[in-house]
Amino acid sequence: MALRPNDVTLRLTPPLAAAARRNRRAAAGGVRVYAVASGAVSTKVENKKPFAPPREVHVQVTHSMPPQKIEIFKSLDDWARDNILSHLKPVEKCWQPQDFLPDPASDGFHDEVKELRERAKEIPDDYFVCLVGDMITEEALPTYQTMLNTLDGVRDETGASPTAWAVWTRAWTAEENRHGDLLNKYLYLTGRVDMRQIEKTIQYLIGSGMDPRTENNPYLGFIYTSFQERATFISHGNTARHAKDFGDLKLAQICGIIASDEKRHETAYTKIVEKLFEIDPDGTVLAFADMMKKKISMPAHLMFDGEDDKLFEHFSMVAQRLGVYTAKDYADILEFLVSRWKISDLTGLSSEGNKAQDYLCTLAARIRRLDERAQSRAKKAGTLPFSWVYGREVQL
């Protein structure tokens, strides 16, 4: 659930008044899409599709990786088979959602559901907003598999390709699919959330896609996934700790087991980028700096529930306040990756590579300073109704 650093600094004003929100929603029939080229002046593009949410989409740069570099990834297929597929688990050894949920075939099913619902009554709405947001993010998995299959040199060319890259993408997707299934079923059983509004949000999100700005470029794509897997590991880990604090040990176990998967996937993606630094340090450090200058966005940044066209922003504000995922986490992830990939130790770089190295090694500290300054100036945000919790007001 990756917030961008400026998301936090720009979200600290109180939310719009209810009347203003209603007016905005009423005017949302003609959807506005903002196309922004890197370093260019914003250009407003009118999108007349009434079923799509208002959203910001950048000018789509495609196939930015030089064709000769595709050969790097083809040559790494055997390496990926030996070093990346080992981070997958055989299906028979994987946990399944049913392992953590009441058994509908059991005579004690109704009692187990009743106990689950009793525990859920002790959990506040703002936590459920974060948990729902995490679940919706996981449920947009078709988009993420699609994104991986846009990457030149590693995509699944047939839908059943035997290359190590294609095997990884399909098996990673299959493992991730359990996360949304488990959280979805748990939330349904609690009775605390409006499942129809949540299901609408999922449909809107998958229909909207995502805008990671990875340009069909596996250098950019694997840097993005390295960052995102660590972000989801942190987010699910924090929801697990909160659930434990609320006394729901089963929910803590659910969030914790998902976090452990994300950690394993993070290890695989960061290992891919580590290999790229070994083979092509200059090209990889330039790609890393490029992604950080664009700012890493959460995969679900285009979420919409049919009512709130700033839903992702408001959800992120709640997550920031509760400490589920924060600007500090964003800076910590960056710092972790800079250390993991030994950016400060790179030598023999071009002049542009040296500039990228300096930028990356100082960026985390800059982000922290900006966040501290913003927090010191921030006014207390108000409350906002979330459709996911039946329109109840939640503190931003």
UniProtKB/Swiss-Prot annotation:
Disruption phenotype: Increased level of stearate (18:0) and reduced level of oleic acid (18:1) in leaves. Spontaneous lesion formation in leaf blades, retarded growth, slight increase in endogenous free salicylic acid (SA) levels and SA/benzothiadiazole (BTH)-specific inducible genes. Enhanced resistance to the blast fungus Magnaporthe grisea and leaf-blight bacteria Xanthomonas oryzae pv. oryzae.
Enzyme Commission (EC) number: 1.14.19.2
Free-text function comment from the UniProt entry: Converts stearoyl-ACP to oleoyl-ACP by introduction of a cis double bond between carbons 9 and 10 of the acyl chain. Required for the repression of the salicylic acid (SA) signaling pathway.
Record note on quaternary structure: Homodimer.
Matches recorded under InterPro entries: Fatty_acid_desaturase-2 (IPR005067), Ferritin-like_SF (IPR009078), RNR-like (IPR012348)
GO BP terms, alphabetized: defense response; fatty acid biosynthetic process; fatty acid metabolic process
Enzymatic reactions: octadecanoyl-[ACP] + 2 reduced [2Fe-2S]-[ferredoxin] + O2 + 2 H(+) = (9Z)-octadecenoyl-[ACP] + 2 oxidized [2Fe-2S]-[ferredoxin] + 2 H2O
Family, per entry: Belongs to the fatty acid desaturase type 2 family.
Binding annotation for Fe cation 2: E176, E229, E262, H265
Transit peptide: 1-32
Subcellular location, record wording: Plastid, Chloroplast
Protein species of origin: Oryza sativa subsp. japonica
Pathway per the UniProt entry: Lipid metabolism; fatty acid metabolism
Cofactor(s) demanded: Fe(2+)
Residues at which Fe cation 1 binds: E138, E176, H179, E262
Residue runs in coiled coils: none
Source species, domain of life: Eukaryota
Protein name in UniProt: Stearoyl-[acyl-carrier-protein] 9-desaturase 2, chloroplastic
Database matches in SUPFAM superfamilies: Ferritin-like (SSF47240)
